[in-house]
Amino acid sequence: MKNKFVELVEKSQLRTDLPEFNPGDSITVNLWIKEGDKQRIQAFKGFVLRKRNRGLHSAFTVRKMSSGVGVERTFQTHSPLIDSIIVEKRADVRRAKLYYMRGLTGKAARIKEKV
């Protein structure tokens, strides 16, 4: 069991402005990138490969294809570096973790869209 003070601090740091999304959904993650003394927003667009719900330590992995190479990036859900998350499409998948998508390309890698 966690300390009451730790629970209070963690609860104050949880973000409530992010939308609800699930594995398979196509999302765009806009995050702050610092280059030298400048800051800018960079978008990472792909589908959610997995989602880990652990309170303040929650994380999700987004996968995209870039020049024919699969790129995966894991984000901390409640990170202050995330500016916004935009859900592009909802997906209808039967698994919680879509690791099998790593080996698929082309038409085999399509995900059924939820209507």
From Swiss-Prot:
This is Large ribosomal subunit protein bL19. Pfam families: Ribosomal_L19. The lineage of its organism: Bacteria, Pseudomonadati, Pseudomonadota, Gammaproteobacteria, Thiotrichales. The keyword tRNA processing does not apply. Keywords: Ribonucleoprotein, Ribosomal protein. Belongs to the bacterial ribosomal protein bL19 family. One of its GO terms (molecular function) is structural constituent of ribosome. HAMAP family: Ribosomal_bL19.
